[in-house]
Amino acid sequence: MPGRRAQRHGALGEGRARFRELIGKVGSGEHTSTGLSRAEAYEALTLMLRGEADGPQMGAFLIAHRIRRPTPEELAGMLEAYRDLGPKLQTPGRRALCFGVPYDGRDRTAPLLPLLALTLAAEGLPVVLHGGEPMPVKYGVTLAELFASLGLEWRGLSLAAVQERLDRHGLALTHQPDHFPAAERLVPIRDAIGKRPPVASLELLWTPHQGQRLLVSGFVHPPTESRAWEALAAVSEAEILTVKGLEGSTDLPTSRAGITARRRQGVVERILLHPRDHGITAPQPAWSDVDSWRVDALAALQDEGPLAESLRWNLAAYLWLAERVSELPEALERATALLRARAGWRLLQAMAA
């Protein structure tokens, strides 16, 4: 009955009633589902981040959106919501390297990104990272946990303190519970549905950095990479590097070719990195636990131990991809010099003091 329907619609409240309409667009059947426009995707995620949709609604939306797969247009709208409502960092006058890796962490291979970030920052390349607490579905080790094991704590800091570290040392990590609590409200819903929703894709495409940058985004499946290119182009991301890294991260493997691509000024260039062609033959270090990783990580920062060769390869590759040097062999020489000089280790000591 129309009157009863209108009464119930009014009882939901404006935000929940509108969100129910948006659920209908992504959750209808094969022949009636229309998907969302960019503006509607922005609106839907904004309603969730501001708490104007309730838990059952958010769960329904996220799982329906996962099943039908977000379009690049929808991802662009959601990315704009993250940009507007999320934390913001700047590196005035300096081009930053910004990494997007899965928030649910690592549980099979030893992470290199904290060590890479420290050494790149020591070389004068600002690095901006972001992450959160252990996250569904993997609940792997997080960037914040890894840094903390090295004596560098990012959790519990104000955003101003993170910006100060970025200004002084060239390295930043925003922590979602502290710096983006609106996004943190989605974590219990993600836990309940037990699958990665499209929001997980945003964590690879978004960065809190504002200004000139090279955005480095990890991926696993080829369709994810092409959607990332389209979505980021739609929001005018100037320079993108996609990396088929370990466990969806941006860590380049040493046991196989590294598959990357650069998108700049609308042109995509596929770049394959073959470690064996440059004398890199180290096996891929496995993950065991934080304490063991800490020992190996501190050794690698001093050019020793089982992670050292993998770190050297990644450091060289990113020095070259960031155009710090013109040729990859030259980058390997520079990476070796930085590790032997313990540049990243020295920065860690300065930041942890």
Give residue spans per PLM region:
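Short, ordered loop/turn segments at secondary-structure junctions
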Residues: 132-135, 178, 245-247
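Residue-level signal for inorganic ion chemistry
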Residues: 61, 147, 203, 315, ...
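Structural motif
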Residues: 95-98, 125-128, 170-178, 196-199, ...
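Acidic, glycine/proline-rich low-complexity segments that act as flexible tails and inter-domain linkers
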Residues: 2-110, 121-123, 127, 279-284, ...
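Phosphate/diphosphate-binding glycine-rich loops and adjacent basic-rich segments that engage nucleotide
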Residues: 157-219
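A generic, well-ordered mixed alpha/beta core segment in the N-terminal half of proteins
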Residues: 94-165
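A hydrophobic, small-residue-rich beta->alpha segment in the mid-to-C-terminal subdomain
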Residues: 266-325, 334
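Glycine-rich ThDP/TPP pyrophosphate-binding loop and its adjacent helix/strand module
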Residues: 211-257
